């Protein structure tokens, strides 16, 4: 695989549902956030953020740099404490049982997190063993490496891998041990088109089996029936929202919605 990123892949592909707001979910989701607040460096990044994920759902986090996409993923993973709000699994706070929440989700951050002195297969066995609490079956490791085209590099030290190969090794973790929820931060960075297609297929299989996925990306990733979540709509008030609302009021109804109404309807 050629792991150089195509120059044309510089913007996220709009999810199929990106042009429409998600209908209100009254059935209760498996994984939900209610009124989430993120504070970073003493600054409120977002507030009042809600989301709901059910079996087979995909959520795409959208927004400019600094809007809190990576922070929200870390909150979802239990790695960052929210400044407010609730994170629930089947209606129960994930903070009540953080070990169970860790076991049910895979978080792949924008850093690869590899042990460069270990071989490719040793890296995958190490991380998978941590999750499973025991040495993983060799066949599981081989299958994950084969899926991402790394089987021929199994005995190579991780430090010798290209940027794209390192990213593929990080992503292979989600296949080497089962988890209901995948949290992926810029998963397509440094990947060529063939590798992105492999990732898309893996996500599609995961969803067909009832899994859920949340993705933050600036790259084109084809995700069928994915819900968009625009994080800049949950930024703390700086006067812009009020200006938009005043402008909408001045224009009258005429098909225009207030900023507040648009924000509420945009919540998944």
PLM region descriptions:
Residues 182-186:
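Catalytic Walker B motif of ABC-type/P-loop ATPase nucleotide-binding domains
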Residues 157-164:
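Conserved ABC ATPase signature
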Residues 111, 116-132:
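Q-loop/switch helix immediately C-terminal to the Walker
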Residues 77:
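Helix-to-loop junction immediately C-terminal to a conserved catalytic motif
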Residues 85-96, 100-101:
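Conserved ABC transporter NBD signature motif
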Residues 171, 210:
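Hydrophobic anchor residue at the start of the ABC signature
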Residues 125, 138-153:
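Conserved ABC ATPase "signature" region
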